[in-house]
């Protein structure tokens, strides 16, 4: 039987662009693993994407996954926009390069082995796991140690 996994994510950026961090919780059968890391210069959208990517990349086998995010950018991007971006060679409808394409490609690859259900939760509305992820992300953003090599000013 396929493992049933829950993932909760959040990203934070102090300035946007500025120092940023992500936080994620991976839950399986009552056990939890948390992830967070801070970056010197990045954006909130990149950190929202990184939270989902890092948690998914931690899975060692195919799983049924429910991912909860407060990011409409991530949820809509992966459930609605990515199919056309790929068809257009990673261009938007107005033929501009997709922002954060490095992370969208990485997220797409990380999803490929799993059955995914995306759930949107309202941020800062008392959702316990979202609040914990927000705390993890903000703590990481306040102590950045990584360089976001994929960040491009203006994205």
Curated annotation (Swiss-Prot):
Annotated positions binding Mg(2+) 2: 10, 134
Protein location: Cytoplasm
GO molecular-function terms, A-Z: magnesium ion binding; nucleic acid binding; RNA-DNA hybrid ribonuclease activity
EC number: 3.1.26.4
Cofactor(s) needed for function: Mg(2+)
Cofactor comment: Binds 1 Mg(2+) ion per subunit. May bind a second metal ion at a regulatory site, or after substrate binding.
Database matches in PROSITE patterns: RNASE_H_1
Reaction catalysed by this enzyme: Endonucleolytic cleavage to 5'-phosphomonoester
RNase H type-1 domain ranges (all copies): 1-142
Cellular-component GO terms for this entry: cytoplasm
NCBIfam families named among the record's database cross-references: PRK00203.1
Function description: Endonuclease that specifically degrades the RNA of RNA-DNA hybrids.
Family of this protein: Belongs to the RNase H family.
Protein name: Ribonuclease H
Species per Swiss-Prot/TrEMBL record: Enterobacter sp. (strain 638)
Gene transcribed to yield this protein: rnhA
